[in-house]
């Protein structure tokens, strides 16, 4: 499905006409605990905590012979049963599955637009240290059980990784003015 220039200009007009809420700035003195941080309440300390950890993304495509629907269903419903406790055991702060279908990627294809990243999904991990992530990858349970399960739905030859830090500018419709990391 292609997005026409008309729809793009309509989206721009709609965004311009929408009233933007005033940003709030709250001073953070004490770091918040994970129990105090939730996606429905803006707390600067929660944002600062997230900016201090490593954010790793693994992009990959589905195994040949399975549909996007089969890939997404298996990953969301089966693989999480195998991998969930494993991630908790290593102290992963957050694990998120990013599901992308060909139809969703087609929505990005516009004349003159940037090339679309052709991956069916990405697993995202927020970990306290790189050693945490490396230990996960070398753990026998990962090698023997999780990798075997991934073979049911992932084309391992397509896998690509990136690591970095989040630098959050807007959180829950609030401008973020205090950061857990600085870039100089």
Where are these regions (language model features)?
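Fungal secretory targeting signals
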Residues: 1-22
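Macromolecular interaction modules
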Residues: 18-184
């Amino acid at each position: 499905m292609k997005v026409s220039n008309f729809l793009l200009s309509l989206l721009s007009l709609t965004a311009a006409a929408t009233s933007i809420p005033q940003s709030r700035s709250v001073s953070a003195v004490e770091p918040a605990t994970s129990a105090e941080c939730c996606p429905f309440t803006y707390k600067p300390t929660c944002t600062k905590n997230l900016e201090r950890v490593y954010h790793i993304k693994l992009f990959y495509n589905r195994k040949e012979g399975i549909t996007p629907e089969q890939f997404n269903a298996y990953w969301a419903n089966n693989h999480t049963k195998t991998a969930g406790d494993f991630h908790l055991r290593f102290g992963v702060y957050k694990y998120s599955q990013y599901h992308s279908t060909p139809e969703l990627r087609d929505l990005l294809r516009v004349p003159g637009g940037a090339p679309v990243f052709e991956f069916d999904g990405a697993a995202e991990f927020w970990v306290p240290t790189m050693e945490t992530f490396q230990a996960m990858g070398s753990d026998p349970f990962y090698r023997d059980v999780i990798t075997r399960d991934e073979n049911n739905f992932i084309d391992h030859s397509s896998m690509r990784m990136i690591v970095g830090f989040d630098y959050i500018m807007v959180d829950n419709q609030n401008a973020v003015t205090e950061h857990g990391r600085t870039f100089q």
